[in-house]
């Protein structure tokens, strides 16, 4: 199993319930594909460095998880088509 770090930027118009639902969806995707969530930072609203999809702010969160490469591939596929997600990045941290 490999370690991964994923940063997610969610739409700024989501409420607490929407952010919680998105967190649950991401955690379920990870666990259903053989991975485990090690930690998740709380969602924080921050100003974006530049406009993305006509938005100037977004909710940021970082997920640390372990899984197989197929786990990261499935997350990549699903998050690309998730409307609540503005941008995301999955990386393998330096050992």
UniProtKB/Swiss-Prot annotation:
A GO biological-process term: translation
Pfam families assigned to the protein according to its UniProt record, in alphabetical order: Ribosomal_S6
Record's keyword terms, sorted: Ribonucleoprotein, Ribosomal protein, RNA-binding, rRNA-binding
Keyword Ribonucleoprotein: yes
CDD domains listed in its UniProt record: bS6 (cd00473)
Domain of life: Bacteria
GO cellular component: cytoplasm; ribonucleoprotein complex; ribosome
InterPro entries per UniProt: Ribosomal_bS6, Ribosomal_bS6_sf, Ribosomal_S6_plastid/chlpt, Transl_elong_EF1B/ribsomal_bS6
Molecular function as annotated in GO: small ribosomal subunit rRNA binding; structural constituent of ribosome
Family: Belongs to the bacterial ribosomal protein bS6 family.
Biological role: Binds together with bS18 to 16S ribosomal RNA.
NCBIfam families in UniProt: S6
Protein name from the UniProt record: Small ribosomal subunit protein bS6
Record organism: Symbiobacterium thermophilum (strain DSM 24528 / JCM 14929 / IAM 14863 / T)
Gene field: rpsF
